[in-house]
């Protein structure tokens, strides 16, 4: 079971009700969330992702309950293997291999939700140093799903947790391409190397 539990009781809004609200977007929050229903470069819906999600995102089921179970399923059914994938690997291939790193887990979950016309965004940040989490002391990625009547619910399928104080959000977007830590073109001769170290500690 995923831990920790949400601080507040989650609404019983069903998957169908969430789709309808996103389509009609009757308020500013659902309107802002609507852009995260659509495919993006690294997190697009696909038939196999839709089929995978159908087992969990069932008609009449509360969406919040369903996305928590979906995150747990990905955590259990996919293997965390550093350097087993690259950002250029198609999402369908990542899904077929059932292995990867945090950005792959996040893209798979986002792709599943978008296949069901639900809003999900990619969150980039860091984990608290010393925590017994996969991906600690390096950049990390997780998912945020839009729950009408609640807002955005963060889920970390890599570690099967609901992110709280141990997760430090830096940015969010449609997928990794929106929040890359380094982007651009470098011109000139000579070799280059980037060396980065990160340590996250509580502020007392």
Predicted regions and their residues:
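Glycine-rich, N-terminal phosphate-binding loop and its surrounding beta-alpha-beta segment
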Residues: 1-10
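Secondary-structure boundary elements
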Residues: 4, 16-100, 108, 174-176, ...
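Hydrophobic/aromatic-rich core segments of domains that either
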Residues: 72, 104-186
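Short intrinsically disordered coil segments
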Residues: 9-19, 157-161, 185-187
């Amino acid at each position: 079971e995923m831990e920790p539990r949400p601080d507040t009781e989650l609404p019983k809004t069903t998957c169908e009700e969430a789709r309808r609200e996103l389509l009609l977007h009757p308020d500013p929050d659902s309107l802002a969330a609507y852009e995260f229903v659509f495919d993006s470069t690294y997190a697009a819906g696909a038939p196999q992702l839709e089929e995978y999600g159908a087992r969990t995102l069932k008609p009449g089921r509360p969406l919040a309950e369903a996305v928590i179970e979906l995150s747990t399923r990905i955590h259990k059914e996919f293997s965390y293997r550093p350097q087993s994938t690259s950002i250029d690997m198609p999402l369908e291939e990542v899904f077929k291999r059932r292995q990867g790193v945090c950005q792959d887990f996040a893209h798979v979950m986002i792709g599943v939700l978008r296949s069901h016309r639900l809003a999900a965004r990619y969150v980039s940040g860091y984990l608290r140093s010393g925590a017994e989490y996969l991906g600690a002391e390096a950049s990390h990625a997780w998912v945020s799903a839009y729950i009408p009547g609640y807002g955005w619910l963060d889920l970390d399928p890599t570690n099967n947790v609901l992110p709280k104080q141990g997760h430090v959000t830096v940015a969010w977007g449609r997928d990794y391409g929106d929040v890359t830590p380094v982007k651009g073109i470098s011109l000139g001769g000579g070799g280059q190397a980037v060396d980065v170290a990160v340590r996250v500690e509580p502020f007392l």
